Every structure is written in structure tokens, then in C-alpha cells.
Amino acid sequence: MLTFVGPDDGEGSPSLVVTRDELGEGPSIARYAGMQDAAVRAGFDGIELLEDRETTVAGHRAVRMTYRWSHSGRTMRQRIWCMVLDGVGYTIVASAADGAFDGLRGTFATALRGFRVE
């Protein structure tokens, strides 16, 4: 796991997290994304799925899901990109306060363009 956390402006710290799961010959990208979706929903009450679509990350097929939820008086937005490459599942998670999320899209996009699997 690799985590980057920005400063908290009082509404929640923006963050970018990359995880890696050894899957072997296991789940497809759709199944892996479904597993990540289930984990998000298990962790938060009142979560709203805003988007669920196929896309690419650094030239690799991916599923992108965007969520919104409130916790402790803060409304947060989270975007998750899921990929399965050579039996390994990768999840990139970008989170920020809902009001700040759109302003960080360029930062998140730069990180995604730089994503490499070696």
C-alpha cells in the first residue's frame, strides 16, 4: 500500500492510496471492482454511488467508481479505479472533501498518468 495525504483544510484531508492484491488466476476486472465496491459500502453508512463505468488508466482497462458520503459532519467524495493485470489487482483511491474534489482532479489525473506496473 502506498498513501499520500494532503493537508486538512478543516473539511478533510485529500488523499491518494494505491493497493495491490495478489489474485492469481482469480477474478475478472468486473468481479474485482465488485469486491472493492462491497468493501466501500461495508465501511460507510449512507454512501451514494455517483458513477460506475469502464475507463483506462495508463493504457490499462479499468473500472472507475465515484462515491459520496457524510461522516462526522463532513461530506467526502471518493473515486476508485480498479485494474487486474497478470493476476494482480490494483486499486487507486482518490479522496477529498466534496467541495474540494473537483479542484483536485488535475492532481489526481497527473498521478494516474504516472501509474506504472513493472
Describe the residue ranges of each PLM region:
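Surface-exposed amphipathic alpha-helical segments
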Residues: 92-118
